[in-house]
């Protein structure tokens, strides 16, 4: 137990009760003192006995203490009650009972002394003060007891027998209560002391356990120190890495900005300078492909009998391996291939005539086939003969086939134009040119390769006008029925099959006389097929046009919705910053405030980290810059700006440290403050000169575009007459004396619409270029200055200083007041501005 909180002393409570009892006794004695004294002898004896007992109290304290300690240990309450009962029976021993009470109290005090000794043994230093206090209390108690005894002796002489009996009874009753309370308090006191002793013993027993706990805590502290050490190492490594990245970025900026600034307009490449050497682009793979195609074109198709190879093909086949060897050597030596015009294969291809070779092959095939052509009956239809031509010649000659049965079989089957069969080419079919669709949807010439019985071959062309000849009336009834069947069958054809495959006309290279009606019917069939192909292409073309019209209508609806949204954006929302941009600007201001604190405490490592965060925020600003520029380049916004009379005066809101005499003086002061070296000063001056040159050109273009756009709105969109009343509020670029023509409102011409759209797009590009130039120049300064110098510059010139929401709210209110009156002029706008500035509390 702590010395500051001493143990409770039950003696004080007991003595307070005794003093109250004695005071009551004295009052009772004083009231009864007037009664006649009786039995003086007994009183004298009592007084004498009391005096004797009081004199012997001091001698018998030790013995009584010993006896009382034993009695207190063995149920003090019972002994005291027994003693009190005996004293009640003997009136002569009244004061002895009082002495016993006092001795018990003293014994309790002695018990306290003994217990205090025990406590002193357990609690070495803390209980010394307690013992001293208890001893002092015992001395005080003895003095109080002696004084009380004297008072009792003096007062007891005047007692009568009756008074003695009453007093004894009262004293016994009070003493019983006091003794019981005293014993209870003493027992509680002793129990508390024993508990303290047990706690001390437990604490002594747990010393070894506490030592183990201390060792574990020391180990945990060592582990925490090691973890902190590793964390510090990681932080140092990360800071070192950030510093390396920052230095690398500075080196990149130095390499980038040592070159002169190039505007996008100077990067335009003319068509004369942008000529590509296609000979250099020609690779070995392309030459191999050309050789392969030339070989395939030169090789004839597989025919039943071999055809003689022309000398040109022989020379080309000899040149091809030589060319491959040359290409392999050039690839090994890393030499560019020669131009395609100088290659031997190109010369052979250029001198090679495909048409002559094809005609020669056709003549040879016709001559060979004419020797083995089967003799068909005269009553066979021409279309059926074409089906018979598909059979191999050897199969017809060697096998005695009944031609009439074969014809009946073909009639039962589907015709050529059915869905189940696909048009095929016989070995003697020659390539034909199919008609193509022109924008005027007129049929084109359909050249077909025909063969005559003679050796000479010629390409004959048949136009659609030839189908109107009177010879077409001489067709037979068989051909009429065939064309009707073909028309009915084509109505059932699937469109997908017609789109994927084309109907090929029937070959006319048969051994049939020209003047025969069968040959004329074949021509009629070919014409029908060509017209059918033409109609199908016409349908496809119409379908394509319908799809385009549908796409255009959808796009028109989309543009209409965008136009409506532009009207809304051109309203009050145009002068309101988005939440993302506002958050970005607030973050930039917070970083600059942290930089100021780091500059005050000279913390360079934290400055490097903050500069890295600052450049990340500036990079994000590029993303939102285009959205804000779109709001300004909106035609509805420009129309209202023309009403207000706004003209772009500055390149960007904020402090311009790159242009003008004020910027020169400020830069000189900055150089002295941050101790700029001579090399850094030269780089800064060159950077400023480049910025000024480009910025002046952009500013000139912006002013020119602004005046042209305003002139368009004043002349074409709304009518306004500038007279003498508003000479002070003249708009730049338009003289006050000029009266603009008042035109009737109506739709603008297409050329005028395209012109204003082009100007607005140019204005958007110029504004974007101007903003990016300003931000790029600030970013390039980091490559010239040290981190501390750059931090000083950024804190003094804050490019995020325009993030004042109150100013934006004021401008938004003015703008909303302007757009409420769509035909209000500059005078009305000026009056509204005056009202707003006179009564700022209304905002």
Curated annotation (Swiss-Prot):
Name recorded for this polypeptide: Probable basic-leucine zipper transcription factor S
Tree of life domain: Eukaryota
Single Gene Ontology BP annotation: regulation of gene expression
Protein's job: Probable transcriptional regulator.
Region spans: Disordered: 27-92, 298-347, 430-478
Biased composition (Polar residues): 298-315
Chain intervals for the UniProt region annotation (Leucine-zipper): 522-529
Keywords, ordered alphabetically: DNA-binding, Nucleus, Transcription, Transcription regulation
Subcellular localization: Nucleus
Molecular-function GO term, any one: sequence-specific DNA binding
CC per GO annotation: nucleus
Family: Belongs to the bZIP family.
Region of interest (Basic motif), residue spans: 519-520
Nucleus listed as a keyword: yes
Domain bZIP: 517-580
Entry-linked CDD domains: bZIP (cd14686)
Protein's gene: bzpS
Biased composition (Low complexity): 316-333
InterPro entries cross-referenced by the UniProt entry: bZIP, bZIP_sf
């Amino acid at each position: 137990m702590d010395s500051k909180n001493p143990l409770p002393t039950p003696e004080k409570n007991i003595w307070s009760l005794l003093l109250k009892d004695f005071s009551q006794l004295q009052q009772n004695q004083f009231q009864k003192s007037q009664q006649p004294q009786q039995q003086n002898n007994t009183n004298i004896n009592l007084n004498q006995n009391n005096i004797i007992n009081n004199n012997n109290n001091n001698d018998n304290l030790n013995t009584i203490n010993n006896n009382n300690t034993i009695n207190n240990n063995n149920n003090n309450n019972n002994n005291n009650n027994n003693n009190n009962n005996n004293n009640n029976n003997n009136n002569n021993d009244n004061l002895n009972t009082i002495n016993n009470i006092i001795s018990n109290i003293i014994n309790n005090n002695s018990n306290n002394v003994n217990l205090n000794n025990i406590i002193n043994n357990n609690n070495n230093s803390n209980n010394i003060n307690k013992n001293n206090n208890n001893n002092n209390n015992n001395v005080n108690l003895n003095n109080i007891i002696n004084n009380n005894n004297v008072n009792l002796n003096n007062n007891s002489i005047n007692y009568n027998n009756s008074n003695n009996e009453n007093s004894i009874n009262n004293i016994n009753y009070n003493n019983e209560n006091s003794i019981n309370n005293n014993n209870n308090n003493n027992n509680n006191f002793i129990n508390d002391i024993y508990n303290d002793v047990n706690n001390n013993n437990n604490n002594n027993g747990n010393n070894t356990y506490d030592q183990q706990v201390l060792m574990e805590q020391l180990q945990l502290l060592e582990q925490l120190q090691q973890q902190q050490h590793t964390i510090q190492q990681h932080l140092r490594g990360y800071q070192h890495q950030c510093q390396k990245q920052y230095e690398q970025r500075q080196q990149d900026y130095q390499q980038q900005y040592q070159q002169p600034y190039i505007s996008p307009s100077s990067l335009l490449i003319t068509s004369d300078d942008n000529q590509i050497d296609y000979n250099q682009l020609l690779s070995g793979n392309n030459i191999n492909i050309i050789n392969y195609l030339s070989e395939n074109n030169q090789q004839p198709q597989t025919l039943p009998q071999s055809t003689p190879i022309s000398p040109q093909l022989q020379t080309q086949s000899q040149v091809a391996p030589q060319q491959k060897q040359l290409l392999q050597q050039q690839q090994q030596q890393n030499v560019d291939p020669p131009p395609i015009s100088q290659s031997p294969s190109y010369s052979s291809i250029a001198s090679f005539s495909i048409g002559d070779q094809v005609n020669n092959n056709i003549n040879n095939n016709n001559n060979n086939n004419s020797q083995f052509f089967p003799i068909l009956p005269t009553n066979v239809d021409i279309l059926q003969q074409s089906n018979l031509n598909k059979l191999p010649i050897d199969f017809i000659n060697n096998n005695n086939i009944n031609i009439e049965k074969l014809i009946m079989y073909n009639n039962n089957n589907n015709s050529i134009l059915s869905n189940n069969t696909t048009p095929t080419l016989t070995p003697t079919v020659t390539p034909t040119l199919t008609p193509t669709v022109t924008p005027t949807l007129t049929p084109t010439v359909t050249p077909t390769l025909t063969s005559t019985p003679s050796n000479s071959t010629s390409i004959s062309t048949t136009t659609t006008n030839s189908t109107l000849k009177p010879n077409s009336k001489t067709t037979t009834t068989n051909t009429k029925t065939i064309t009707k069947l073909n028309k009915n069958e084509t109505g059932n054809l699937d469109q997908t099959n017609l789109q994927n495959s084309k109907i090929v006309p029937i070959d006319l290279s048969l051994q049939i006389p020209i003047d025969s009606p069968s040959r004329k019917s074949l021509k009629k069939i070919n014409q029908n097929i060509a017209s059918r192909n033409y109609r199908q292409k016409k349908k496809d073309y119409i379908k394509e046009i319908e799809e385009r019209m549908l796409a255009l209508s959808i796009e028109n609806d989309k543009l209409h919705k965008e136009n409506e949204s532009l009207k809304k954006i051109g309203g009050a929302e145009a002068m309101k910053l988005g939440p993302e941009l506002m958050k970005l600007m607030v973050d930039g201001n917070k970083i600059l405030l942290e930089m100021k604190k780091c500059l005050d405490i000279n913390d360079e490592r934290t400055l490097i980290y903050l500069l890295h965060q600052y450049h990340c925020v500036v990079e994000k600003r590029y993303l939102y810059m285009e959205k804000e520029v779109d709001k300004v380049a909106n035609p509805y916004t420009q129309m209202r700006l023309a009403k207000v009379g706004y003209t772009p005066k500055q390149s960007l809101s904020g402090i311009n440290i790159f242009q003008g005499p004020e910027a020169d003086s400020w830069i000189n002061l900055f150089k002295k403050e941050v101790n700029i070296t001579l090399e850094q000063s030269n780089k800064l001056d060159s950077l400023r000169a480049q910025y000024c040159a480009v910025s002046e050109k952009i500013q000139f273009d912006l002013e020119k575009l602004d005046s042209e756009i305003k002139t368009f709105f004043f002349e074409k969109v709304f009518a306004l007459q500038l007279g003498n009343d508003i000479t002070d509020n003249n708009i730049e670029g338009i003289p006050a004396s000029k009266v603009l023509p008042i035109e009737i409102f109506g739709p603008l011409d297409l050329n005028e619409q395209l012109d204003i759209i082009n100007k607005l797009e140019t204005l958007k590009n110029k504004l974007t270029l101007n903003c990016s130039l300003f931000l790029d120049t600030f970013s390039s300064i980091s490559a010239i200055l040290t981190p501390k110098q750059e931090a000083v510059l950024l804190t003094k010139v804050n490019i995020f200083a325009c993030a004042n929401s109150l100013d934006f709210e004021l401008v938004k209110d003015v703008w909303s007041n302007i757009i409420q009156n769509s035909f209000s002029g500059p005078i009305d706008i000026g009056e509204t501005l005056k009202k707003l500035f006179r009564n700022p509390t209304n905002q």
